[in-house]
Amino acid sequence: MCSVSGVLILNPKNFEKVELKLASILKKAEDRGRDSFGIVVIQKDGTVKVRKSIGKPSEKEELLYGILDEDSRVVIANNRAEPTTEYVRQKTEDDIQPFIGDRYIVTHNGIIANDLELEKKYELKRKTKIDSAILPLLLDKTWDGNLEALKGILEQIKGSFALVIGDKKNPDRIFLAQNFKPLYMAYDHSLESLFFTSLDEYFDAKPFDPVNITKLEPYSVVMVTSNKLITTLPIMEKRKKYRVLVVASGGLDSTVAATKLLREGHEVTLIHFNYHHKAEEKEREAVRKIAEYLQIPLLEINTDLFKIIGHATLIKGGGEIVKDRKGEEGAEFAHEWVPARNLIFFSVSLAIAEAYGYDAIASGINLEEAGAYPDNEMEFIRMLNKLSPYATGPNKRIEILMPVGNLVKHEIVKLGYEIGAPLHLTWSCYEGGQKHCGKCGPCYMRKMAFRINGLKDPVEYDEE
């Protein structure tokens, strides 16, 4: 495994400071690569300068300096931790990344499982058994430097990759590609140079440094040019209509979310968790009726996990639900917090989605409840989306959607009414009585939401 790094130098007069920053990045990247390191510089005329060594950059600092000059345009670099499956006892320069082809220079983090097949198919000849060495040879033979074509070539690779690629014929640009392996980009305004590496912490950017750091999108190919043009293409094309697994409680939010997705033309399946909570029976009854009404499939998951976790008043035997100020108190603070519930629900749903070929999972997470519950915050979903490529298998891209994520409760009711969501079948109450209690937080918000819209709430309450 490796750390891959690179630099696109926009102002060559800053080469000495660029070199200092690159050296710092390579030394910090030793935690991802301690066995060897290499630096390849592409000059403005397409010639290259090379420094390679076994060991750590911090132990061979003299090799990190004096390689750049005013004619340097692109730097491709690597720190390598040698996998057990590719151990080479007597290493030569041919065994050390970056690997250099007739036209392309490549640094690679990941594993290429079908390197032998590619070598045979394209009649390539490596000088080392290292799998990454196949890449510049493959690109030399099959790639014309077009970004769209690069995407097609990478689709042939079985395994994992984050790539930084230099082109001797075009020293004014750098290419990047990744599936689930990480890549970060940082533009240093003071150095007028664009740096790339495997982890953002290697940039060592302070809060007031003139540096913009961006994480590159998983499953993408990118071209960056010296005139600050960035072109990005997805490796995996998104379908216009998704198969979506909607985490559904039987309440207003998830019901409106599911209906909205359905009206947009997506193929929707509900997934409901029976987790030994007080309203379990009423929610199960509601979600079954909702699935039948919408004529969509329903998956039910039974779990005692939260009974074991305990410490939540929402669980049966967990204590009294807060009903102060007619429910307003419960609407404003997470008294009924269930430890990590939504994260667990999403994790199980993500696994099922991956196993059964769904494109996305969704829920009724919304802006209103984000005020009280951390796992209803839009940022929670944004972070899950960033995590998803690393929690699912290679070439399995599952999005997490929030159809009502930017809405508050009365807006959700309004939307549900307009799109014909079965609001009359929903169950919102934390209790599991014959009617909604009318005094818990969800009951309070529900009543207020219908009242604001001038609509009659179709459910009955014990207390109005």
Swiss-Prot record:
ATP binds at residues 248-258. SUPFAM superfamilies: Adenine nucleotide alpha hydrolases-like, N-terminal nucleophile aminohydrolases (Ntn hydrolases). Zn(2+) binds at residues 429, 437, 440, 443. Residues 2-227 form the Glutamine amidotransferase type-2 domain. It catalyses: 7-carboxy-7-deazaguanine + NH4(+) + ATP = 7-cyano-7-deazaguanine + ADP + phosphate + H2O + H(+). It holds the Pfam family GATase_7. One of its GO terms (molecular function) is ATP binding. Binds 1 zinc ion per subunit. Its cofactor is Zn(2+). Disulfide bonds: none annotated. Catalyzes the ATP-dependent conversion of 7-carboxy-7-deazaguanine (CDG) to 7-cyano-7-deazaguanine (preQ(0)). PANTHER family: 7-CYANO-7-DEAZAGUANINE SYNTHASE. Belongs to the QueC family. HAMAP family: QueC. This is 7-cyano-7-deazaguanine synthase. It comes from Saccharolobus solfataricus (strain ATCC 35092 / DSM 1617 / JCM 11322 / P2) (Sulfolobus solfataricus).
